[in-house]
Amino acid sequence: MHYLLIYDLSPDYLERRGQFRNEHLKLAWDASARGELVLGGALADPVDNAVLLFKGDSPEAAERFVAADPYVKNGLVARWKVRPWTTVVGETASSPVRAG
């Protein structure tokens, strides 16, 4: 199963992220190395949200990420949510569905 971690970023995110970015990126790359985090990054124009794609049997990896993320701990993330995502197309789809 896939899970989307969606961050609503604070208005001053770009100005403040520098001091926390290395720790945040280490956390993300470590989650990727464990096979939990597939992709992640901020949306552009405007930079008001970020989306991280996790895979696993439950949303636990995404929730652990949030609990450890310096962006969340230091107020760069105003709100967050984890949503299950039923992926049906693509090589790594969790529930592949092909045309009949």
Predicted regions and their residues:
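Conserved, structured core segments of small domains
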Residues: M1-G100
